[in-house]
Amino acid sequence: AASDVYKRQKHSFPTTQIDHYDYLAAIFDNLKRINTILIDFNRDIWQYISMDYFTQSVNKNEVGSSAMPHKVNPIDFENSEGNLSFANSIFEYLSGKLPISRLQRDLTDSTVLRNIGVPFAHTVIALNSINKGLNKIEVNKKTIDEDLENNWAVVAEAIQTILRRENYPKPYEALKNLTRTGKKINQERIGEFIDKLDIKESNKIELKKINPSNYTGI
């Protein structure tokens, strides 16, 4: 085993003194990018929970708020976000510090290297918190369906795309005049708009089949 390790050793040709640590900087930068994606994920889930798109199972041993006992906070995702942010600040420092050394021989790297484990530990804690949080949430289909039903304007994109396919003149402007009036867009108004279009009846039938629940943007 020792022989195999020895064979894998390579000279670091750019330096004649301490190692240049470029490989460590690359690792830390990559981990920081991964953590940034997870921070964004945590914030998205937090937002979906606040919008009631996801519900959380209640743990009677957890305290949601010191003032409001009824609150069920997304504490696992908040915990994860905090740990990932802290880990990233250290990863950024390490990747910027370690490649720098006075004439490739100062010892500032020695104390810094002793703290490499810190951001990894916070990242592991964050990952565990994400897993814990995901196991506590469920999709609230009722709220999502209600939200979709109250937002018929989302089908305007699909209608415009089909009108372009049929070479309908200025479809964007037609939908803009419908949707940007300050008035609520509902199924009835969409239907009235479609009925007034100068297109084939088969196209009108196709357009009326589109609704917020079955249109996915494709």
Stretches with model-predicted labels:
Residues T16-R102:
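Glycine-rich anion/phosphate-binding loop at the beta-strand->alpha-helix junction
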Residues A1-Y6:
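Short, small-residue-biased leader/transition segments that mark boundaries at the very start
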Residues F13-P14, L38, R105, L207:
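Generic secretory/membrane-interface signal
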Residues V63-I218:
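Catalytic-core signal marking the mid-to-C-terminal active-site face
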Residues T15-T16, T55, P171, N186:
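Short, surface-exposed helix-loop/turn micro-motifs enriched in polar/charged residues
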Residues K7-T16:
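A short, charged helix-loop
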